[in-house]
């Protein structure tokens, strides 16, 4: 009995002070971290190229990481380009190629319109010249009713008829001229030419400027025996044909 009491006393004395105050099973160990239980995450799946693969697959993870990197790279490049575009100095509208092309197109259209107008004006001018010449020719051919002569003496003047038919009868031609013009003819001479036509020289009995012009206007351009004849007033010295 005494031995047990001695042993119990030794055991009590051998304990530390903290062991004597707090039971051993209630002492929390200091400095020892509790092990956390690893929670196993649920495994997911992803679709790659039409196939269902595990989300924890290394290839899938690498592709996702590469996609994120590419996305960030594209965003940074777009931001960089946007900053360069904003910092770019504004060009003058006149220096733009599109403006230059439009301006050149406008100039070309203006030049084309001006060229067409010039060509039209040239044609109109040419047409007017032709009309004036035609009108002037008709006036010359038709003759004016007003006949003026500053020389009162027309004794040396006569009428020359060209492009008559070969072998025309002088007396018949004289009678026709007198009957139509009502002018007396003193002499008429006809000569056949090697060219195939005949020429007549007509001298009036009482030549005056008015009577000569009257006969010329009546017979100039007349159709005689199928030929269009011409009549001119000439001086006796200028008619060098021998009859």
Curated annotation (Swiss-Prot):
The lineage of its organism: Eukaryota, Fungi, Dikarya, Ascomycota, Saccharomycotina. GO terms for molecular function: nucleic acid binding. It comes from the Eukaryota. Keywords: Phosphoprotein. The modification Phosphoserine is found at residue 96. GO terms for cellular component: nucleus. Residues 71-120 are annotated as: Disordered. Present with 2140 molecules/cell in log phase SD medium. It comes from Saccharomyces cerevisiae (strain ATCC 204508 / S288c). Residues 78-88 have a biased composition (Basic residues). This is Uncharacterized protein YHR127W. One of its GO terms (biological process) is mitotic spindle elongation.
